């Protein structure tokens, strides 16, 4: 059920996306009316959260069943005794799925209001509480302990510290203020704690702030799928070319039983430190993270470096993951994007530079997995078509497990090639209306089918590098 307006985009950005989703191949296959309907549905679904919260179990430190039991206890506490089921994914054995309850339509709105920024609002819809830096505006006499209605300023028009706001805002639910208005807007830079504890969110999801941090990693379903598609083996040398914050890096290491070598690169120092922190927290020793630009990761002088630091000699890695920087247009919920067409379209050249480096660094018969969390044709299927033409040594491969839909028409790929891709399309199923009664009556297989389809927008392609002749 759609309760929020469709994602707010600049008109030129919406037209740019529409051209991709109503390209000649799609219109020929579906008809103009159906293609347009699917595109409008997509825009509506992007502003809503997925119907499941997905967490990956760190199987390096604990069994899935043990962590599932601990998590059930945690959910009982958070949900005041409500019995929300936890499902283990049948194809991704280290993934647990928690259904989201909502939208809850009978929440009474309060006179006392707080306005949060769009990014904070998106996090609230995925189970987060409101932290003080995310609060943009609050009612004049708000005190600690007050019941507050929380709204998202989806267009970024509310002025910091305002006492009221009449612009476009979306109701996120009610919570209890942990701080007064005066404390929130005191100007103290160290004020980073919780501002509002959400007690009646429109979408009820668990909060994972400091919950079983050594055993669980919060990850969208397609993101957890990627490392399984890569299928790393113990003893191999793996490269995660754009690794921050380390979710996929640590997953790769866990799937290898921490045996082998996982090299993680990112060009921003603080992000690399986060990868190292996550590896340490999860007890993984096979990861080495470096602050380095992935486009320059190929060593040009062919002199072997005994230290094993970047840049690397060509054909150094058994498997490479390129989870590429992208426009992120598949993220959910996302009620507004202020980017220009130039910004949305700016990633394709960078992705190709990274792809070129990845192909050079991959051993013959090695596996390369390319993924993005966006929905654009230019960053997904068009990149696959370009790669297959640019690098005759690459062959597109079927993926296992195959959970997402096939690739989108429009880049000139054959039907067989499209079937070898995985595209997660947020418009694939109607938005669910989930309450405790419907959960009790739901069949497990129906819930799993919904979890596979109602996710963020995401794309995965798998290649093998042919043997040199």
Curated annotation (Swiss-Prot):
Residues 111-203 form the PUA domain. It catalyses: cytidine(72) in tRNA(Thr) + S-adenosyl-L-methionine = 5-methylcytidine(72) in tRNA(Thr) + S-adenosyl-L-homocysteine + H(+); cytidine(72) in tRNA(Cys) + S-adenosyl-L-methionine = 5-methylcytidine(72) in tRNA(Cys) + S-adenosyl-L-homocysteine + H(+). It is found in: Cytoplasm. It is an enzyme of class 2 (transferase). One of its GO terms (molecular function) is tRNA binding. The modification N6-acetyllysine is found at residue 419. S-adenosyl-L-methionine binds at residues 242-248, 266, 293, 323. CDD domains: AdoMet_MTases, PUA_NSun6-like. Its EC number is 2.1.1.-. Changing residue 181 to A: Substantially decreases tRNA methyltransferase activity. Pfam families: Methyltr_RsmB-F. The active site is at residue 373. Belongs to the class I-like SAM-binding methyltransferase superfamily. RsmB/NOP family. This is tRNA (cytosine(72)-C(5))-methyltransferase NSUN6. It comes from Homo sapiens. The lineage of its organism: Eukaryota, Metazoa, Chordata, Craniata, Vertebrata. The gene is NSUN6.
């Amino acid at each position: 059920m759609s309760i929020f307006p469709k994602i707010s985009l600049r008109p030129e950005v919406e037209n740019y996306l529409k051209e991709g989703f109503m390209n000649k191949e799609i219109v020929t296959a579906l008809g103009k009316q159906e293609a347009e309907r699917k595109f409008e549905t997509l825009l509506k679904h992007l502003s809503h959260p997925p119907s499941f919260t997905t967490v990956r179990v760190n199987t390096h430190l604990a069994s899935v069943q043990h962590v599932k039991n601990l998590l059930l206890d945690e959910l009982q506490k958070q949900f005041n005794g409500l019995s929300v089921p936890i499902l283990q994914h049948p194809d991704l054995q280290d993934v647990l799925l928690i259904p989201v309850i909502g939208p809850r339509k009978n929440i009474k709105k309060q006179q006392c209001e707080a306005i949060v920024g769009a990014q904070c609002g998106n996090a609230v819809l995925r189970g987060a509480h409101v932290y003080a830096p995310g609060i943009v505006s609050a009612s004049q006499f708000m005190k600690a302990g007050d019941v507050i209605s929380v709204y998202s300023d989806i267009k970024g028009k509310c002025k910091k510290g305002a006492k009221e706001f009449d612009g476009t805002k979306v109701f996120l639910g009610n919570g209890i203020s942990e701080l007064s208005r005066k404390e929130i807007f005191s100007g103290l830079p160290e004020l980073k704690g919780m501002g509002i504890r959400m007690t009646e969110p429109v979408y009820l999801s668990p909060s994972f702030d400091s919950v079983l941090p050594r055993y669980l990693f919060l990850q969208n379903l397609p993101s957890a799928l990627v490392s399984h598609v890569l299928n790393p083996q113990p003893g191999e040398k793996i490269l995660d070319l754009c690794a921050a914050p380390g979710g996929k890096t640590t997953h790769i290491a866990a799937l290898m039983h921490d045996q082998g070598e996982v090299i993680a690169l990112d060009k921003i120092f603080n992000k690399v430190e986060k990868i190292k922190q996550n590896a340490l927290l999860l007890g993984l020793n096979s990861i080495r993270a470096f602050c380095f630009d992935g486009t320059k990761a190929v060593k040009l002088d062919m002199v072997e470096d005994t230290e094993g630091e970047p840049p690397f000699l060509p054909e150094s890695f058994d498997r490479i993951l390129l989870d590429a920087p992208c426009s992120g247009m598949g993220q959910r919920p996302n009620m507004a994007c202020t980017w220009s067409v130039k910004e949305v379209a700016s990633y394709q050249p960078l992705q190709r530079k990274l792809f070129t480096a990845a192909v050079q660094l991959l051993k013959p018969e090695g596996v390369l997995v390319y993924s993005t969390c966006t929905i654009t044709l230019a960053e997904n299927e068009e990149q696959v078509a370009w790669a297959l033409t640019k690098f005759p040594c690459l062959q597109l491969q079927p993926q296992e497990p195959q959970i997402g839909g096939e690739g989108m028409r429009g880049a000139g790929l054959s039907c067989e090639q499209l079937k070898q891709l995985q595209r997660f399309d947020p418009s694939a199923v109607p938005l669910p209306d989930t309450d405790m009664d419907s959960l009790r009556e739901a069949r497990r297989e129906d819930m799993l089918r919904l979890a596979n389809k109602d996710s963020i927008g995401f794309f995965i392609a798998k290649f093998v590098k042919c043997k040199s002749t």
